[in-house]
């Protein structure tokens, strides 16, 4: 699994004119899944993200987790995180998980985050979405279970 995490002040996702999810302070997660991903990757990333200390404490030091600040997560499926751009100018997505498998793993990941007592909003898997966010920091962290 590959995740791009951005710390935000607020964010929302919509399909067409319909807002599907929105949050205040928290994380936007762009979530990419490959065919070899499963429970081990889901559990590892849910645990890591739920305990990640990137919010400022009273001394302005990154020392608080999303749970500490009562933040929320906006989780967005993002198969393009597995783009291969080595050949030519058009990316290949052959390394991205097949849609059925990816959807199952994505749903399990969101549930694992909720099992860590996090509020999770989502977009629509496989849809063309518009994501609006206000970065805080900015803080952007990339997780890749192939490199843990």
Curated annotation (Swiss-Prot):
The protein's Enzyme Commission number: 3.1.1.96
GO cellular component term of the entry, any: cytoplasm
An example Gene Ontology biological process: D-amino acid catabolic process
Keyword field contains Cytoplasm: yes
Localization terms from the record: Cytoplasm
InterPro entries: Daa-tRNA_deacyls_DTD, DTD-like_sf
Main location: cytoplasm
Domain notes: A Gly-cisPro motif from one monomer fits into the active site of the other monomer to allow specific chiral rejection of L-amino acids.
Name of the featured protein: D-aminoacyl-tRNA deacylase
Species of provenance: Oenococcus oeni (strain ATCC BAA-331 / PSU-1)
Gene this chain is encoded by: dtd
């Amino acid at each position: 699994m590959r995740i791009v995490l951005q710390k935000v002040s607020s964010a929302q996702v919509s399909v067409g004119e319909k807002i599907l999810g929105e949050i205040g302070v928290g994380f936007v997660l762009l979530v990419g899944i490959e065919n070899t991903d499963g429970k081990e990757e889901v559990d590892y990333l849910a645990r890591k993200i739920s305990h990640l200390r990137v919010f400022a404490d009273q001394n302005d030091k990154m020392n608080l987790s999303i749970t500490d600040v009562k933040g929320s997560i906006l989780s967005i499926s993002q198969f393009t995180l597995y783009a291969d751009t080595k050949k030519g100018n058009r990316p290949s997505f052959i390394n991205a998980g097949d849609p059925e498998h990816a959807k199952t793993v994505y749903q399990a990941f969101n549930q694992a985050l909720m099992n860590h007592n996090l509020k999770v909003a989502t977009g629509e898997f496989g849809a063309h979405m518009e994501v609006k966010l206000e970065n805080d920091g900015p803080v952007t962290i990339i997780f890749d279970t192939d490199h843990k």
